[in-house]
UniProtKB/Swiss-Prot annotation:
This is RNA-directed RNA polymerase catalytic subunit. Belongs to the influenza viruses polymerase PB1 family. RNA-dependent RNA polymerase which is responsible for replication and transcription of virus RNA segments. The transcription of viral mRNAs occurs by a unique mechanism called cap-snatching. 5' methylated caps of cellular mRNAs are cleaved after 10-13 nucleotides by PA. In turn, these short capped RNAs are used as primers by PB1 for transcription of viral mRNAs. During virus replication, PB1 initiates RNA synthesis and copy vRNA into complementary RNA (cRNA) which in turn serves as a template for the production of more vRNAs. GO terms for cellular component: host cell cytoplasm; host cell nucleus. The keyword Glycosyltransferase does not apply. The gene is PB1. One of its GO terms (molecular function) is RNA binding. Coiled coil: none annotated. Residues 249-256 are annotated as: Promoter-binding site. It is an enzyme of class 2 (transferase). It comes from Influenza A virus (strain A/Equine/Tennessee/5/1986 H3N8). A motif (Nuclear localization signal) lies at residues 187-195, 203-216.
């Protein structure tokens, strides 16, 4: 049956229909090939926005650098990065005047964090540029490699486990004449296969030592690796994002901690809160402006968009802000916080993999690595690429591009929010000293501006003044993309406000459905998503019930577990029918074993195993949840697991769901093809860390949330813990004398082995 889509909107208020215009159903677009072109675009654009600045050369690495700070006063309409230091400092001073003690208190809180943070803070996060291997790695591996190299180069402060001490090593490493690193390499050789008698290529992985001189090391320490941002909806062109190495990460973390503490105290900041808390915060600002615009005043709201926020921000500006914010603090603290912006002023952008060339006639493919772009003949490239390469060539040093201005995506979200809020703060009547005044909301590069004035001319004047003030600190409000409306209707960070926030349900659409982790987790996540949307996103009972039925259907198709009495034939139906026939209480079978669905919108919070426990046959229970069943015991499940769900907007969210360990909570094995590549050595390292950590957490169950602090090694700690536990168990009669003696013997053997080593 064809449905005329306009019929769907006959009785729907306009604000509820807005979400249907979002590009959120279906798969998001992914990028293919290399990000080299996008990265060159970013570098070239950033320099273009600051082109009237001063050129200097970094004496350490010989990189040309462009400094637009205090450059010519910005022009109308053209985005530019010419922030004026005195204006930024003045905005900071007024922010402090309106919020007495805000900087002082935030500094004290941050100082406490700085002294307590452990190095393992840096293991959080996904892909990280690993400077030792010159490519991306999981954060934990990159950190481990860095520490390993530091220790082999006599940098040992990090052994205390404090992040602060690791950063001391980073500082010292930059003064060393050379650093010795271990790199992985591949040897290929042709050998004859004994079985098939064919020639095959055999790969062996080797590790070799390599020395980096000071210049090469500094370049790597200051490098941001670039990739293409994936899964961005509603855009035609892809764009590049950056991932910094371990030397920069720690310093950035402390700066962002300080900025986060400041943002928490600012009512106009949309960070670091999220969800319903954020909505409440925003609603307060709107309420304040609407209440104050008495009958005599007009109130308008701009749904704002800034042009190229990151590319016009400048690390030198952030340095000025930090210098001001920490001005009465101890010297060591000021130094630690100023290093991140200084490193960013000297950053280098790695251009990615390079370009792929294909010759259709000769059926040849070859890759031109990014390092060769400086010297290769440009006749092979098309015009647009030629222009890009010509522009970027003067900036290249050893195949990386010097990128002093600009910030790259997502590095200082909190600190740039503080800058944005400081301009919103200047809209108070006492500062504008005229009939118009403004307030608003800022969340990284997204803003909403509310202007009140007695008449339209006043509103226009207020907007103009805001626009110009922003220009002075390197913020470029886009006149083309921002729009103004009577206060009461606007959009901010994909929240639609219409006399209150309307649920933008389409944003959640991608997270409905079967996640593909395993049967147990998928069932749990599926119902939790529906439950959460009933709580947070106006998902009504009837729609929720329908969503649930669709989910169960989807789930049954995904895992081929249709009800035991169905006529549908699948690979599993034969086994499931057999199970169905020999089960007395058929209601007790899990959906994934061909049982009926017992979920409705009232019991979504109960894990399926618990929901059906009383209804299960004894022998079914015994197979399903028996820890001695090899299909159960393989996986230890915390009582709460967390899954990654993909909302349509923003980063993947971690969502908690209840988990019960059954035969259905299997873990898929890792793809074997990785085992034959150069990643293999890294994989083995990773597994070793994983095993050590798992073992450690067996001895210290609380270690998953509170890291032990102290100087003894992990092994010493585990041995002493084992002895204590064994004695307690022996004295309380939980273990026999022989077992106790055996444990003690093992402990002594381990200590003996350590001494010999």
């Amino acid at each position: 049956m064809d449905v005329n889509p306009t019929l769907l909107f006959l009785k729907v208020p306009a604000q509820n229909a807005i979400s249907t215009t979002f590009p959120y159903t279906g798969d998001p677009p992914y990028s293919h090939g290399t990000g080299t072109g996008y990265t060159m675009d970013t570098v070239n654009r950033t320099h273009q926005y600051s082109e009237k600045g001063k050129w200097t050369t970094n004496t350490e690495i010989g990189a040309p650098q462009l400094n637009p700070i205090d450059g010519p006063l910005p022009e109308d309409n053209e985005p530019s990065g010419y922030a004026q230091t005195d204006c930024v400092l003045e905005a900071m001073a007024f922010l402090e005047e309106s919020h007495p003690g805000i900087f002082e208190n935030s500094c004290l809180e941050t100082m406490e964090v700085v002294q307590q943070t452990r190095v393992d803070k840096l293991t959080q996060g996904r892909q990280t540029y690993d400077w030792t291997l010159n490519r991306n790695q999981p954060a934990a591996t990159a950190l481990a490699n860095t520490i390993e190299v530091f220790r082999s180069n006599d940098l040992t402060s990090n052994e205390s486990g404090r992040l602060m001490d690791f950063l001391k090593d980073v500082m010292e490493s930059m003064n060393k004449e050379e650093m010795e690193i271990t790199t992985h390499f591949q040897r290929k050789r042709r050998v004859r296969d004994n079985m098939t008698k064919k020639m095959v290529t055999q790969r062996t992985i080797g590790k070799k030592k390599q020395r980096l001189n000071r210049k090469s090391y500094l370049i790597r320490a200051l490098t941001l690796n670039t990739m293409t941002k994936d899964a961005e909806r509603g855009k035609l062109k892809r764009r590049a994002i950056a991932t910094p190495g371990m030397q920069i990460r720690g310093f950035v973390y402390f700066v962002e901690t300080l900025a986060r503490r400041i943002c928490e105290k600012l009512e106009q900041s949309g960070l670091p809160v999220g969800g319903n808390e954020k909505k409440a915060k925003l609603a307060n600002v709107v309420r304040k402006m609407m209440t104050n615009s008495q009958d005599t005043e007009l109130s308008f709201t701009i749904t704002g968009d800034n042009t190229k926020w990151n590319e016009n921000q400048n690390p030198r500006m952030f340095l000025a802000m930090i210098t001001y914010i920490t001005r009465n603090q101890p010297e060591w603290f000021r130094n630690v916080l100023s290093i991140a912006p200084i490193m960013f002023s000297n950053k280098m952008a790695r251009l990615g993999k390079g370009y792929m060339f294909e010759s259709k006639s000769m059926k040849l493919r070859t890759q031109i690595p990014a390092g060769m772009l400086a010297s290769i003949d440009l006749k092979y490239f098309n015009d647009s690429t030629k222009k890009k390469i010509e522009k970027i060539r003067p900036l290249l040093v050893d195949g990386t591009a010097s990128l002093s201005p600009g910030m790259m995506m997502g590095m200082f979200n909190m600190l740039s929010t503080v800058l944005g809020v400081s301009i919103l703060n200047l809209g108070q009547r006492k500062y504008t000293k005229t009939t118009y005044w403004w307030d608003g909301l800022q969340s990284s590069d997204d803003f909403a501006l509310i202007v009140n004035a007695p008449n339209h001319e006043g509103i226009q004047a207020g907007v103009d003044r805001f626009y110009r003030t922003c220009k002075l600190v390197g913020i470029n409000m886009s006149k083309k993309k921002s729009y103004i409306n009577r206060t009461g209707t606007f959009e901010f960070t994909s929240f639609f406000y219409r006399y209150g926030f309307v649920a933008n349900f389409s944003m959640e659409l991608p997270s409905f459905g079967v996640s593909g982790i395993n049967e147990s987790a998928d069932m749990s996540i599926g119902v939790t998503v529906i439950k959460n949307n009933m709580i947070n996103n106006d998902l009504g009972p009837a729609t929720a019930q329908m969503a649930l039925q669709l989910f169960i259907k989807d789930y049954r198709y995904t895992y081929r577990c249709h009800r035991g009495d169905t006529q549908i034939q699948t690979r599993r139906s034969f086994e499931l029918k057999k199970l169905w026939e020999q089960t007395r209480s058929k209601t007790g079978l899990l959906v994934s074993d061909g049982g009926p669905n017992l979920y409705n919108i009232r019991n979504l919070h109960i894990p399926e195993v618990c929901l059906k426990w009383e209804l299960m046959d004894e022998d079914y229970k015994g197979r399903l949840c028996n820890p001695l069943n090899p299909f159960v015991s393989h996986k230890e499940i915390e009582s709460v697991n967390s899954a990654v769900v993909m909302p349509a907007h923003g980063p993947a969210k971690s969502m908690e769901y209840d988990a019960v360990a059954t035969t259905h909570s299997w873990i898929p094995k890792r793809n074997r093809s990785i085992l034959n590549t150069s990643q293999r050595g890294i994989l083995e390292d990773e597994q070793m860390y994983q095993k050590c950590c798992n073992l450690f957490e067996k001895f210290f169950p609380s270690s998953s949330y509170r890291r032990p602090v102290g100087i003894s090694s992990m092994v010493e700690a585990m041995v002493s813990r084992a002895r204590i536990d064994a004695r307690i168990d022996f004295e309380s009669g939980r273990i026999k004398k022989e077992e106790f003696a055996e444990i003690m013997k093992i402990c002594s053997t381990i200590e003996e082995l350590r001494r010999q080593k």
